[in-house]
């Protein structure tokens, strides 16, 4: 990652920030954080689950690699590369990786 003098953040290869995802693990790396946004890159090993939970903030999930089963309240979807999901605050949701998954979480914190 590099930051210019104007405080722009440029990440040439976002997926490269999470590598070597060990079996039976979920890894995360904060890419960006300010008063209004938190960007976190997740890597899931196949079969790993982020159990049902809620967030106090609206959020966006952008799936970059792999396939996952995603539950959003009563709705279930099959996520694949390119899947983009907006979730309102307090929506129960969970993610189960079917394959190795890389996903960008954008939490809208203001």
Task: List PLM regions with ranges.
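Short, conserved beta-strand element in jelly-roll/cupin
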Residues: 43-45, 56-70
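Ligand-binding loop in jelly-roll beta-barrel domains
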Residues: 89-110
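A short, N-terminal "cap"/entry segment at the start of jelly-roll beta-barrel domains
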Residues: 1-36, 71
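Conserved short histidine dyad/triad with adjacent acidic residue
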Residues: 25, 35-55
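Short acidic-glycine-tyrosine-enriched beta hairpin
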Residues: 74-89
């Amino acid at each position: 990652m590099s930051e210019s003098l104007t405080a722009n953040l440029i990440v040439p290869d976002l997926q490269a920030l999470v590598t070597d995802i060990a079996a039976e693990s979920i890894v995360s790396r904060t890419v960006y954080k300010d008063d209004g946004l938190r960007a976190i890159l997740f890597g899931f090993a196949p079969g790993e689950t982020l159990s049902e939970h809620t967030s106090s903030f609206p959020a966006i999930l952008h799936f970059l690699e792999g396939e996952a089963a995603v539950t959003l309240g009563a709705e279930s979807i099959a996520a694949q590369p390119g899947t983009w999901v907006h979730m309102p605050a307090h929506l129960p949701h969970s993610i189960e990786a079917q394959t190795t998954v890389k996903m960008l979480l954008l939490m809208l914190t203001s």
